[in-house]
């Protein structure tokens, strides 16, 4: 399929998301806490139905989906085994959206029919789709949606309007065009668009941070610079999974297993959708809901075993209630735990704990990247300074990129990306000041910054080739960093260039004569103007 056709499908998908949001608003659910549940579940339901039908038509090119309802048990069992091998769900004919339109679209209990379908799909595919929390609570893929409309009389019509929008859209065209390429490039911007109204955390809430695709892509490309097979990748503050998806795409979805944890129920729901859209259903069981700092689920089996770790943790958070418990864990937080401040507890630098956790989880050949406030890289005190000193003294850090302000949607804080390893293997550190790159734009009356393709290429080329560029990048030794009081700020190492020009004695005298002549002319003009003004004032009369 030509690119312009694929672009049209992408635009149609974005329009579908907008339509679903408009419907929710018209039924009183605009900006409601449950709106995202309805939209993500309906979007996922349509995706799974279309994927099921697409695969059915590939397996049985001489039959239509209507023939599926007459399949005997033996035929279904064989078909289901093929589906399971491909990590696709088992759906009965009466689970499909087409069946709802065929049999129940005008029913007064249509909402109950959809709820029942969601429950059946979840139960019949529990092994494939269920996830868990740190306390072993099972979290199903779907839940009933009609409950979110308070007025029972509106539930059937609300469901009817939603399904009507779903019916008029078809993912199958996208599947056919993406057969020979990964779907990440198609679905990533769609997922980003889906998220934009549900990720307004204001920079302060736990696990609601969203990493822009451009930043996620830079991190993935700088971490993975050679073919990689059978690796474990981990994000302890996974959010909606943007960093993990970019890394998995760079590695290859069949060559990696994802591990994730996040405390936010909303983020985990979005993360599961992201995994399914990106053919990473095999890693769903590793997406855990829970507090990474007090109950790091994956530490039990994979501490010191992760090949790659990425993280964009919350920067500041009040964790005073968990402070005592966290402080007892001297192994995970070996460099210490920030003190509880007397005044504003919401400013506790929680990211320092995630950083230490990441260092613990890497294997000996592992590499990682974490997003942190730019102030961290030149911290002179506190746990921040202890971490920087550890990274430098142990020669673990190998790169820092200072990003432009306002490049992250939910925080005005200047941020940097720190690249690190588990085992010392480098003698120099690449420091890049990309803070002046990008272009400004306005979204919802807020000024933001985005990186252009040329900006991304410049960052990648400079980092990978360890190129030194005036006022942009520096390649420094660990001894130099110690001499600069452990600062990882690129600007500390830029050489101020002497831009003055050398001139001869004769040229100097000529310039002085020229300047003298110009000033004399200006003074003469000034005196003439002064005389003219005085004469004019003298000629003024009182009438």
Label the model's feature ranges.
Residues 2-5, 303-543:
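A conserved structural/catalytic subdomain of Rossmann-like adenosyl-cofactor enzymes
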Residues 18, 33-42, 139, 160, ...:
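Non-catalytic, well-ordered alpha-helical scaffold segments
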Residues 200-204:
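Conserved adenine-nucleotide phosphate-binding loops and their immediately adjacent elements
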Residues 1-85, 539-543:
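Non-catalytic accessory regions of SAM-dependent methyltransferases
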Residues 50-199:
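Long recognition/docking surfaces used for binding and targeting
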Residues 205-311, 316-328, 372-375, 385-388, ...:
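Conserved S-adenosyl-L-methionine
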Residues 18-21, 167, 191-199, 220-224, ...:
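Amphipathic, well-packed alpha-helical segments that form the structural scaffold of globular domains
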Residues 34, 81-87, 425-434:
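A structural motif corresponding to the C-terminal lobe/cap of the Radical SAM core domain
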């Amino acid at each position: 399929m030509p690119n312009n056709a694929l672009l049209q499908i992408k635009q149609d998908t974005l329009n579908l998301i907008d339509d679903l949001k408009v419907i929710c608003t018209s039924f009183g659910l605009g900006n409601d806490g449950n709106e995202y549940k309805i939209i993500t579940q309906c979007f996922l339901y349509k995706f799974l139905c279309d994927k099921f039908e697409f695969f059915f038509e590939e397996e049985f090119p001489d039959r239509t989906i209507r023939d599926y309802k007459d399949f005997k048990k033996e035929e279904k069992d064989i078909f289901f085994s093929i589906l399971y091998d491909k990590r696709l769900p088992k759906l009965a004919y009466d689970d499909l959206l087409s069946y709802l339109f065929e049999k129940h679209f005008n029913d007064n209990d249509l909402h109950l029919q959809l709820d029942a379908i969601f429950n059946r799909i979840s139960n019949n595919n529990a092994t494939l789709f269920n996830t868990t929390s740190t306390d072993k609570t099972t979290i199903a893929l779907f839940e009933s949606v009609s409950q979110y409309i308070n007025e029972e009389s509106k539930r059937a019509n609300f469901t009817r309007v939603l399904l009507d929008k779903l019916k008029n859209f078809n993912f199958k065209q996208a599947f056919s065009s993406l057969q020979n390429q990964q779907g990440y490039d198609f679905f990533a911007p769609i997922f980003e668009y889906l998220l934009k109204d549900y990720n307004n955390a204001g920079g302060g809430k736990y696990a609601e941070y969203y990493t822009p695709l451009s930043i996620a892509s830079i991190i993935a490309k700088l971490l993975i610079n050679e073919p990689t097979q059978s690796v474990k990748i981990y994000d302890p503050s996974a959010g909606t999974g943007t960093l993990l998806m970019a890394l998995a795409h760079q590695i290859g979805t069949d060559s990696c297993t994802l591990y994730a944890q996040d405390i936010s129920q909303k983020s985990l729901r979005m993360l599961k959708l992201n995994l399914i859209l990106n053919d990473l259903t095999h890693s769903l069981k590793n997406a855990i809901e829970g507090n990474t700092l007090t109950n790091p689920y994956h530490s039990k089996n994979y501490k010191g075993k992760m090949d790659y770790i990425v993280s964009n943790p919350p920067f500041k958070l009040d964790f005073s209630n968990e402070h005592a418990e966290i402080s007892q864990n001297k192994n995970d937080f070996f460099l210490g735990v920030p003190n509880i401040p007397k005044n504003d507890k919401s400013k506790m630098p929680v990211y320092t704990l995630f950083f230490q956790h990441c260092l613990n989880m890497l294997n000996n050949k592992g590499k990682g990247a974490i997003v942190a406030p730019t102030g961290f890289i030149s911290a002179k005190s506190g746990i921040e300074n202890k971490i920087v000193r550890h990274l430098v003294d142990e020669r673990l850090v190998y790169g820092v990129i200072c990003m432009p302000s306002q490049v992250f949607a939910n925080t005005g804080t200047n941020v940097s990306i720190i690249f690190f390893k588990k085992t010392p293997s480098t003698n120099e550190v690449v420091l890049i000041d990309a803070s002046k790159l990008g272009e400004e734009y306005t979204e919802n009356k807020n000024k933001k910054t985005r990186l252009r393709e040329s900006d991304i290429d410049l960052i990648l080329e400079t980092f990978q080739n360890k190129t030194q560029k005036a006022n942009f990048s520096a390649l420094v030794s660990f001894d130099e960093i110690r001499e600069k009081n452990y600062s990882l700020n690129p600007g500390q190492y830029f050489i101020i260039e002497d831009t003055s020009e050398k001139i001869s004695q004769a040229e100097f005298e000529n310039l002085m004569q020229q300047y003298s002549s110009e000033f004399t002319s200006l003074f003469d003009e000034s005196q003439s103007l002064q005389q003219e003004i005085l004469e004019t004032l003298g000629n003024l009369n009182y009438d």
